[in-house]
Structures are given as structure tokens and as C-alpha cells.
């Protein structure tokens, strides 16, 4: 039978519940347990797919095509279990499900209320999510409850967790509470009162935490831990200090050293083997002792909020681990390039344009791509970054001066990139597809396997085929592919049934390393294995640095 660990947060948001939950999962997995994780989001949106990156950060896409919270990316990077749609749900999904049942008459005319109907539905979603784990029936399901204790939005989820713990019985569920212990500089000391009040809020609704994870900018002294223990009614050895670390991959060892996994296993009556965190120690060793160094420019419009590119940043870090290369990322606002030109790119070892939506800043990105192509600087374009690379090539090499995407110019006569409902076929006729067509609507989501053209750089990187995740509405228009190929561009991978361009590259006779991909490879990169595309990109960046005669 699956046992549950509920992870809650107090005092303020953004303390790192997702990292804490993922780190605990990594330790338990290293002890031979099958583990899955779930994220419960209190917002009323059905999913984060249409939420602004400035509000929500990255949208992480699962293999089965769900648009989910970025914490699911942390989960997949820390453990081997893959996440699915069922691993993340929101208040919006819960209410949508309950209202649908009420309309069907499932409640037999009863008054539908938060308790028991909403809380019962939350429990059903939790158990369904745990049961859908790709590792088979998990020994432990770690459930991260979003928001902050005391917020009205989180109350139904906390109440559902309390009821579920009671229903499952002793030693079947436990609670881990992450809270802030701030350092007040004027007083010169850490303050425990916010933590005391946060635990008090939990106890008011009937939840007694078994473990406190106390976040601070430094290790919490024993005297303060004893004080927290006494006022929170939590054993002293279960008051665990979580201080700021320069790498999230140090957190599993930090928590294990203080006995978190031992406490959880004792509470849940589990007797697994000892933890083996040697992999994490090796990763940290590689991280702290690189042999080389490169600087990669990430050109985008969300550069002030790096949470928007969380998986991409981590994928570059993974590549740094597996190439013994420190990767310095410079975030460059594409609108600044539009205003000031490409001089800010000239010291870079490589250029990357990530995915995105909307017209703002696109001409700056295209200017950066032109610079990378003409200056022989390694270039990686992801999703929109590939589409813009195709547009730049069409304009500046093929001579299609009005080449554009209908996302940015709906009237352009040279629709090099377009919605699937806006394509022109080879005869110049509009090719229309509807919701009933094989591709569904205007957004392509989830994993798809595609064959790779032999003899290409893509084959050197991936092998015979590529299986990656997608999240996009627009595609390269097949009508223009013959002209692009005549200009030298190579379509190195296509979807097997629709023949859609998935990867493009320039031959080495034109450029040493210029690759665009329609999918999002960052979603499948892990610290354990890295990712072949990002490893190749970082190696190309270092080769470019050496070729320019810059000291490594």
C-alpha cells in the first residue's frame, strides 16, 4: 500500500518546497523505494498553460502532453519516475470535476459543499495520481501542497490532507512543513517567531507536522532549533536546518545528513536499505571542479525572470557537468538588441534563442541569429528559436525579404511559419485542419518520436531517431522547404506521419554548429545523464572559444 508524505509551506512563498520534496524523493529512491510526487496548485486556472511567465514562471510539459507546474521539472530531474498529467492538479480542475458530477446527478440532489465534496474529490485526485505512477505502485507518494499555510486558497487542500491522513490510519501518512527562519541584521540573530506562528496555523486546522524544514540563509544554531522544537511540539531531531546552497544538487545530502529520510521511514514504518547518495556527491564534485569555461548568451524577452527558463538553465548546467565545463549564462534582452545592435553578443562563445510566444522582441532575436550565422558562432534555437532561424535564413540567404510568421504578421505573403490552419500547400492553396484532424487543435503537446536524416549533425547527436516533447502552435510551412533546402538549409528530422520539420541545421561547409529544434529538449535533461543536444552545444561553444584564441 502506498504511503503519503504531505509537504506544506509557511510564512512566505518561494521557499523551495519543490526542491525539498524532490530532494526527499531522491533520498528515498536511493534507499530502494519506489517514489512518485504530486503537486497541488491552489489557483483556479485549470492549468498554467495560458498564464503569463511573469506570474507563473515556466510551464513544464510532461510526456503525455500536460502543461504543468515547473516543480514537476524538478521532480523528473531528481528521480527516475516520469511525471504525467495526473501528477499535477489545480483548484480549477477540482471544481470543474465536481460541477460536472453535480450536473450529471452523481450527488443525488444533495447540497454540494467544500466539505465533503471538494475535499473528497481532492483525495480522489491524490490517490489517482499516485496510482498512475510510471514506476508501478509506489511505496511513497510525496504530495506538495502549493501556497502558504494561512491562505484561504490552500484550506481545502490542507483539510483534504488532514482527512486523508485520518482515513488511512497511523503510519500511513506524515507531514513535513517548510518554513522561514529569517535573519534580522539589526538584531544580529535568527528569528523563530514566524515559524512558531506558521506551525500554530497548521495545528489550528488539525495538522501536527512530524518534521520542520527551517529555511535560512545560514545553518540554524542548536539553541534556536531547541526553541523551535519546544514551541512547535516537534522533536528536536525533526527540526532540520535548510540553509542557502550554491547548488540545488547539494540539498539531498544536506537533508540526509540531518536524518530526514530516517525520520520519515520510522514514521511510515518502512525499513529500506541504507541511502546511497554517491551519484549526487559525484555530480557536486564535477560541478565544483570544471576544466573549461564558456559563456553562452540566452537571447529572450523574459530575461529578467529566469524562472521562465528553469528547465533550460538546468539543462545547460547538466551539460556543464558532463563536459567538465563551467557554463556562464548571460541573459540578453532581445529588445535591447533591436535598439542597440549586436555588439553585446561579440564576446559570447555561443548563442541560444529559447522558446516563446508573441511579436515583441522578435526582430532582436532575428538580428542575434543573423550575427551567429554570419560570424560562425554556435547557435541553438529551440521552438520559436528554430522558427526565427528559418525566417532569418529565408530573408537573408534565400531572398524571401517578406518572410515571416503569421504569429507576427498575419498579412505576410511569405508565410514561412504559420498555424496548421493557415498553411499553403505546394499549389498555393490554403490547407485547413480542424479539431477533428489528426494533429488536434492549434497546440501540439507531449512527446513524439521522429526519424532523423542519415549523415546529418542531428544523427551524430541523437542517433537514428529523436523522441522529445513539444509545446507550440506554429510550424515551418512545408511550401517553402524546397527553397530553403536549395539555399543550403538541411531539414534533418521530420514527423513520420505529417512530414513536419522537427530539426534544421546548416551544413558544416556553411557553419560549424547551427541547429534548430521545434521541440523542447530541456524537458528531458537530467543531472544523471545530461542531454546529448546540450552536451554537443557546450562542446561547440568551447571549440569556438579555442578557435578564437581565448584562454579557456
Swiss-Prot record:
It comes from Burkholderia ambifaria (strain ATCC BAA-244 / DSM 16087 / CCUG 44356 / LMG 19182 / AMMD) (Burkholderia cepacia (strain AMMD)). The keyword Nucleotide-binding applies. Homotetramer. Coiled coil: none annotated. It holds the Pfam family CTP_synth_N. This is CTP synthase. Residues 1-270 are annotated as: Amidoligase domain. InterPro entries: Class_I_gatase-like (IPR029062), CTP_synthase (IPR004468), CTP_synthase_N (IPR017456), GATASE (IPR017926), GATase1_CTP_Synthase (IPR033828), P-loop_NTPase (IPR027417). Its EC number is 6.3.4.2. It comes from the Bacteria. Pathway: Pyrimidine metabolism; CTP biosynthesis via de novo pathway; CTP from UDP: step 2/2. GO terms for cellular component: cytosol. GO terms for biological process: 'de novo' CTP biosynthetic process; pyrimidine nucleobase biosynthetic process. HAMAP family: PyrG (MF_01227). Residues 295-547 form the Glutamine amidotransferase type-1 domain.
